[in-house]
Amino acid sequence: ELDDEVVRTRDNALMLSLEVTGIDGVTSGAATVSALRAGFAHLLDTLDERFTFYLHRMMRPAETGIAPIHGASFAGDIDKAWSRELDRRNLQDSVLILTVVRRQVAPLAVPLFGKAAARVWGEDTARRLEELREVASILETGLGIKTRRMKISDGSLVGFYASLLTGELRDQPRSPYCLLAEDAAGASVQFGKGGVEIEEGAATPRFAAVLYVKSYATATWPGMLDALGAAQDTIITHCYTPIERGSIAERVKRRVAQMRSAEDIAATVEAQLFEAADKAESGALGFGVHQMTITVFA
């Protein structure tokens, strides 16, 4: 780890995770959700391939915060019965965790000498760390949402990393004798055909399967995935890397040329591609590489 909030990956990327609270697709108004979507999309459109965003939607046990009524009384009996019913229902809170990654796009030219190499390494890290914190600050203050930075010291960040294997989001302390990767990957996983078996690291042995979404609908809307019934046993993951606006037009021209040479392009498709390139250059449309997976636990 670089500090209490920022982690350096094996490929020298820097990442920081935020828990987003206060808004969801079920209880929030359509106008509020649409405004948040537009603001977030505008931020993504101003960035390029140096940044990647991961959004995880998962569940954790809800904390009711109800003070118990002690003693033998009618109110106490009702309170005990109500508490037992809440425990039976196993209430869950929906959690959104946004991870911002400042990637190392080009290989870093490091001198051979130790002091010079350390200086170049330190300057590059400081520059990318400043850019990462700047984007995180915009997310925290410019979108009108409540966020909480996940930290190693309180166990929230390590617990989040570990939950991606187990599906159980809970705080996990940092071990002073292990690498962060070892703390995050403490579960024992056996891979089988079409799924995995989690033998250790979770409260009970579990099975999991990862579904990769490769065909997209013609239109989407905020909250459309909230209809998944088994919410507490699923993790929905989005990964998005923006593409620089200046390269869109060149990519469109190259794609059209390839389709023309293969005689596999219609006039309407060609027109749509050039229209999209014009919108990208004018700032009305953004492009990026998106991946989506759904992990189901049982």
Question: Which residues does each predicted region cover?
Answer:
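Extended, folded cores of ATP/NTP-driven motor/assembly subunits in large transport
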Residues: 1-298
